[in-house]
Amino acid sequence: MSFSSDVRNELARIIPEKECCRKAELAALLAISGDLVVGEDGRRILKVQADNAATARKIITLLKENYQIPSTFKALEQKRFKRKRIYEVNVLLDGEDEALNKELEEILLLREKETTPVLNRSLLGRTCCKRAYLRGIFLSRGSINRPEGEYHLELVLNDSRMALAVQKMLDKFALEPGLVERKNYLVVYLKESEKIVDFLRVVEASRALLNFENVRIIKSVRNNVNRQVNCETANLSKTIDASLRQIELIKRLLEEQGLEILPGNLRDLAEMRMSYTDASLKELGDLLDPPLSKSGVAYRMRKLEESVKEILQED
């Protein structure tokens, strides 16, 4: 099962306690995934599709808790896409209860001859309702990469008004989403791991958030270890190259002039380098008498190399 499916299954099981939040989330689910059709008897039916059974069951639950509206539920085979099955909830909008019909129309802002519901912004006055609405948006049109891979979360919308509204709403939570057009859709997306974590916190996907954070921490530690190893490897390579260069110079001096030509402090360092070819500068400094700091050894080693080069050039 994908990480997106895990998140959706978790969100599908969250039923808001407040009626205002239930209405906001239901309105998002109906507005994003719903299409209006006219039945044979002339009455309007709202067909809402979901890509998993848990989301479909949530739509039915919210309809029942808010409006006591009966709805039908069925599974459909969808062969054109990778997922083999989708779920459809059918809601009769022109029932016998006129007051209920009117309330549904107001929530969805249904207009004559329109086939797509539009969200009523008056439902989003409170922060808790915005959270519920974004939860409904993700359930309908959201996806998120596994935290082990590249960080990416997106909400795919087919209505420009809805996309801009979602982008502004995410901005209210300081998530700073991007917006890009992809074929016939508008995609609101997040690519920073911190922003994705914040989004999961906003929609109250606590279990997914914990899993995401655990993987993110492990990745961060692993990356830090890799950087440290690479840095140490590079430093070791530099140390080996410098040691080989120094030993080669000292060998040439031994063959052509001898070490006695060097000043005492440089001669001691040259002899120490030849005796301990694998030692680092710090280790050489500890072996000298009196001991010398790493920076002191580095300075003296540069003087040694310069002196040897001058002597060999004069010869």
Curated annotation (Swiss-Prot):
Keyword DNA-binding listed: yes
GO biological process assignments: cell division; regulation of sporulation
An annotated Gene Ontology molecular function: DNA binding
DNA-binding region: 280-313
Keywords, in A-Z order: Cell cycle, Cell division, DNA-binding
Similarity comment text for this entry: Belongs to the WhiA family.
Function: Involved in cell division and chromosome segregation.
Protein name in the entry: Probable cell division protein WhiA
Organism encoding this protein: Syntrophomonas wolfei subsp. wolfei (strain DSM 2245B / Goettingen)
